[in-house]
Curated annotation (Swiss-Prot):
This is Cysteine--tRNA ligase. Its EC number is 6.1.1.16. SUPFAM superfamilies: Anticodon-binding domain of a subclass of class I aminoacyl-tRNA synthetases (SSF47323), Nucleotidylyl transferase (SSF52374). Its main location: cytoplasm. One of its GO terms (cellular component) is cytosol. A motif ('HIGH' region) lies at residues 33-43. The gene is cysS. It catalyses: tRNA(Cys) + L-cysteine + ATP = L-cysteinyl-tRNA(Cys) + AMP + diphosphate. Binds 1 zinc ion per subunit. Gene3D superfamilies: Cysteine-tRNA ligase, C-terminal anti-codon recognition domain, HUPs. It is found in: Cytoplasm.
C-alpha cells in the first residue's frame, strides 16, 4: 500500500495554472483591514478561506509564516476620527481591538499582524530605492509617484491593456501613476526626503511584504476586487526593484453577493460580521463560505443561511449522540480525532470544499447508522474521522458532556438495563432537550 504524502496543489488565480507546493516553507501575505469601522461579512470570507489554508498546510507538515497588515492611517480614518472628535490613534485602537476580538470569535488561527504606522519610518527608504532606479518622480506639488510607463510589465495581473482610472490628482504624468508619498496637511504626518506627509496605500503593503519576506513570498491573497489596482501596483513596485514578480502564487477570493449585488459599504447592502455573530454561531458563517469554491462569487440569501443553520445542527447532533453512546456503553474514553484522508485530499486540492463536504455528510450518515445498530467499533472510527474533518475546517465542537450530563446518561443507561422503561424515557427526554440524543 502506497504511503500518502500530503502536498498542496494550488490553482494560481492570475496565471490559472495548477502548481504543487514542493517547498516546505510557505510564506503568506493576506491584505488586511483599514480600521475605520467594523468588518462586514464580505470582509470575513478571505480571512476564513486563508485560515483553512493555514490549517491544511500545517496538517501537511508545511512550515507556515502568515503575515497580515493592519492599515491604521488613511483618509477615511482621519474623516471618521474628526466626526467622532477623537484622534486617529484612539479610533484605530478601538477598531483593532474589535478586529482581533472578531478573529477569535471566528476561530481564526493566530496571524502575525503588522500595523502600518509602526513601520512608516522605514518606508521612505523603500520609496527612495524606486526613485533611485528611475521608477518614481516628484510632482510639482511635491507628491512622489510611481511611473507606470517605466515598467513594460504593468497590467500583467489585470491581464489586459490597462486604460485610465478615475483619480482626483492633477499633478501626475500619467493617470495610472500611483502615489508613493503624498504631502498633506490633514491628520498625522511623518517626515521624509519629500517633505511631511504619509505613504500611499499601495506602497504600504508592498513595503510590508518586502520587510517580512524580501523576494521570498509564496502566496499573496485578498479579495478579487484588490486584483486591480492594488495588487497590480504592489507587483509593479516589486518588479521595479527585483525584476521578478512579487509572489510565486496569487489567491483571490470571490465577492460575497447579496441579492445578486456585491456586498459592500459603498452600496450600503452589507451586514456587519459582529451583528451576524450575535444571531448565529460562527460555524454557520464558516459553513456558508464552504458552499462555493473560494474564487467564485457567493450569493448570500436568507434561505442559504437557514440551510447552513440546519446543516450545522445535524452535524452537531451526530457528534453529540455519538459521544453519548460512548458514555452509555461505558467506554473509557471518547476517541481522539484521526486524520481522514478523503477530506484531507479534497482540501489539499486547491481547497475543494465541495468534495470535502460530500465526505463529511458520508461520515454523518455512517455515524447515524452505527448509532442505530449500536456499532461501537464503527462509531469509534467514524467519530474520530469526523472530529478531524471538522477541526481542519475550523468548526469543531466542544464537548457538552459535562460531569452532570455524564451522570444523567449513566442514569438513563441504568434505568434501561433494569427494565424501568418509563423512568428511562423521562431521562431520555431530558437528554434530547440538552442535545445529547
Amino acid at each position: 500500500m502506497n504511503q500518502f504524502e500530503p502536498k498542496f496543489t494550488l490553482i494560481d488565480t492570475v496565471s490559472n495554472q495548477s502548481v504543487v507546493l514542493e517547498q516546505k516553507q510557505i510564506n503568506i501575505y493576506l491584505c488586511g483591514p483599514t480600521v475605520y469601522n467594523d468588518l462586514h461579512l464580505g470582509n470575513t470570507r478571505p480571512l476564513i478561506v486563508f485560515d483553512v489554508l493555514q490549517r491544511v498546510l500545517q496538517a501537511a507538515q508545511y512550515k507556515v509564516q502568515f503575515v497580515q497588515n493592519i492599515t491604521d492611517i488613511d483618509d477615511k480614518i482621519i474623516k471618521i476620527a474628526q466626526q467622532q472628535e477623537i484622534s486617529e490613534a484612539q479610533l484605530c485602537k478601538q477598531q483593532i481591538t474589535a478586529y482581533k476580538s472578531l478573529l477569535k470569535k471566528l476561530n481564526i488561527l493566530p496571524i502575525k499582524h503588522l500595523q502600518v504606522t509602526d513601520k512608516i519610518d522605514k518606508m521612505p527608504g523603500y520609496i527612495a530605492r524606486l526613485v533611485k532606479k528611475g521608477f518614481a518622480y516628484v510632482s510639482p506639488l511635491g507628491n512622489t509617484y510611481f511611473s507606470v510607463s517605466q515598467l513594460p510589465q504593468y497590467g500583467i495581473l489585470a491581464n489586459r491593456v490597462v486604460e485610465t482610472i478615475e483619480d482626483e490628482a492633477t499633478d501626475k504624468r500619467n493617470k495610472l501613476d500611483f502615489v508613493l508619498w503624498k504631502q498633506t496637511t490633514a491628520g498625522v504626518k511623518w517626515n521624509s526626503p519629500w517633505g511631511w506627509g504619509r505613504p500611499g496605500w499601495h506602497v504600504e503593503c508592498a513595503f510590508l511584504i518586502d520587510y517580512s519576506f524580501k523576494d521570498q513570498l509564496t502566496i499573496h491573497g485578498g479579495g478579487v476586487d484588490l486584483k486591480f489596482p492594488h495588487h497590480e501596483n504592489e507587483n509593479a513596485m516589486h518588479m521595479a526593484l527585483y525584476d521578478k514578480p512579487l509572489t510565486q502564487h496569487w489567491m483571490h477570493i470571490g465577492h460575497l453577493m447579496f441579492e445578486n449585488q456585491k456586498m459592500s459599504k459603498s452600496l450600503q447592502n452589507f451586514l456587519l460580521a459582529v451583528d451576524f455573530l450575535t444571531i448565529h454561531d460562527f460555524r454557520i458563517l464558516r459553513w456558508l463560505f464552504y458552499q462555493k469554491h473560494y474564487y467564485h462569487p457567493l450569493d448570500l440569501s436568507q434561505s442559504l443561511i437557514e440551510q447552513a443553520c440546519s446543516d450545522i445542527k445535524r452535524i452537531q447532533k451526530a457528534v453529540n449522540v455519538c459521544r453519548t453512546w460512548f458514555v452509555y456503553s461505558e467506554q473509557s474514553a471518547i476517541p481522539a480525532p484521526k486524520q481522514f484522508e478523503p477530506v484531507f485530499k479534497a482540501l489539499l486540492n486547491n481547497l475543494n470544499f465541495a468534495n470535502a463536504i460530500t465526505h463529511i455528510w458520508k461520515l454523518v450518515k455512517q455515524i447515524n447508522h452505527d448509532v442505530s445498530k449500536q456499532n461501537l467499533s464503527g462509531l469509534k472510527e467514524h467519530l474520530s474521522h469526523l472530529e478531524w474533518a471538522l477541526n481542519i475546517l475550523g468548526i469543531g465542537f466542544k464537548s457538552i458532556h459535562t460531569k452532570l450530563n455524564v451522570q444523567l446518561i449513566k442514569k438513563w443507561a441504568s434505568l434501561r438495563k433494569n427494565g424501568q422503561l418509563d423512568k428511562a424515557d423521562e431521562v431520555r427526554q431530558k437528554l434530547i432537550k440538552k442535545g445529547l440524543l
